[in-house]
A protein has these predicted regions:
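Hydrolase active-site cap/lid region
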Residues: 231-284
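Short, surface-exposed "cap/lid" segments of acyl-processing enzymes
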Residues: 9-22, 141-172
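Catalytic nucleophile-loop/oxyanion-hole region of alpha/beta-hydrolase
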Residues: 161-170, 181-217
């Protein structure tokens, strides 16, 4: 891989960072983690920003921090936009991804997004008319049909967290021989609880449109709040005898008991915010939505959690496993060292064990499991010392 192919251009508008050195340090760590180089341009004025954006665009996809409400000109899908504060999504043609509301750490997520798109690109598939009703599809090399993994991201159902959180696992699973279907869904604002659930259900059914995917060998996998959505979707698809039904459901550090999570005000009240009520005010919705209340699901499950996760998260995984084990469901618990995000780190020991357990369930014993393909310019991924989303 040539040096220019590994260089990320990052352009800052005047005044968007409070301390330039801190931004440089954060970006430097993110680049080092991916074995990339970068050129940072801090524009002195609007004209300088426009020149820097034009220059960066000539070299390919770039990162731009234009400032809240500002616009910029870039080729279609040619930029990763970062806004440190909360704001409306940029739906303009020039922005492939808009990372917003994640603070200065949004720069790290932007570098990771650049890396995955540059070296392991997927294809966007729409399953609805809304911009958030989309998935990123990756297909392994070779002849299909392949088993498929549907990935559901977490982030406590809030709009600032998107499917880029699952890019690293999608890349790893594709290298292991799985079609990956990395789901985005509508969140927050006018998009209430029923909308979220219906989007995930529709995305799962849309797997049937992928010729190289084998829907009989479908895994639905969710992280944190995404695990709640994944297991609820699995329960619904099984109960309703949907055309596409998961063969395995995987919870990675999942929010598996909505009543408990709500009563403990996890994620600063995220459950009540998303559902639109507390448990006492809408017990029926909580019962339909909470994975532990849906047992038995009727399909095999893996329940994964790192032992240094937040105590509430670890407790929910253990509680769920114990409850599931008392039903006819086939359920396995996997624990190991790490925190809430170790379970979505492809380099971690607990993810290796999880991937092996998925293989054991989904692949015929006569079919050898391919090792993950060599990755250009490999890196360990996100710096665990930097901030992360909550669930």
């Amino acid at each position: 891989v040539t040096e220019p192919a590994c260089r990320v251009d990052i352009v800052f508008a005047p005044g968007v960072v409070a301390h330039r050195g801190t931004a440089e340090e954060l970006v430097g760590r993110a680049l080092d983690a991916r074995s990339l180089t970068g050129e940072l341009t801090f524009a002195a004025d609007t004209a300088g920003l426009e020149r820097a954006v034009r220059s960066a665009a000539r070299r390919g996809e770039f990162v731009v921090v234009p400032g809240a409400g500002a616009s910029f000109t870039a080729p279609a899908g040619g930029a990763i936009r970062v806004d440190f504060g909360e704001c409306e999504a940029d739906r303009s043609a020039g922005a492939r991804v808009h990372i917003r509301g994640r603070g200065l750490d949004g720069l790290r997520y932007a570098v990771d997004s650049w890396y995955h798109h540059r070296f392991h690109p997927g294809r966007i598939v729409r399953y609805g008319d809304h911009p958030d009703q989309r998935v990123e599809l990756r297909i392994p090399d070779g002849d299909g049909p392949f088993p498929v993994v549907v990935l559901i991201h977490g982030g406590f159902w809030r709009p600032r967290w998107e499917s880029d959180l699952m890019d690293a696992l999608a890349v790893d699973l594709t290298a292991r021989g799985y079609v990956t279907w990395n789901v985005e869904y509508r969140r927050g604002g006018e998009n209430r609880w029923a909308t979220i659930a219906s989007d995930v259900a529709d995305a799962v059914q849309a797997v049937a449109t992928v010729p190289s995917a084998d829907p009989e060998r479908l895994v639905i996998l969710g992280h944190s709040a995404g695990a709640q959505l994944a297991l609820r979707a699995a329960a619904d698809a099984t109960a309703e005898e949907a055309a596409v039904r998961p063969a395995l459901a995987v919870s990675l550090a999942g929010v598996l008991n909505l009543r408990l999570a709500g009563e403990r005000h996890l994620g600063e009240g995220a459950v009540a915010d998303a559902v639109g009520s507390d448990w006492a005010g809408d017990r029926a919705t909580y019962e339909r939505s909470s994975p532990i209340a849906r047992l038995p699901l009727g399909i095999p499950q893996l329940v994964v959690c790192a032992v240094d996760d937040e105590p509430d998260m670890l407790e929910m995984s253990r509680e769920y496993h114990e409850a599931a084990a008392a039903t006819p469901d086939d359920v396995v618990r996997i624990e190991g060292p790490g925190d809430h995000f170790t379970v979505v780190d492809p380099e971690s020991e607990i993810w290796r064990r999880t991937a092996e357990a998925i293989d054991a369930r989904i692949r015929p014993r006569t079919t050898p499991t391919p090792p993950p393909a060599a990755r250009p310019r490999p890196g360990r991924g996100a710096d665990p010392r930097t901030s992360r989303p909550s669930s």
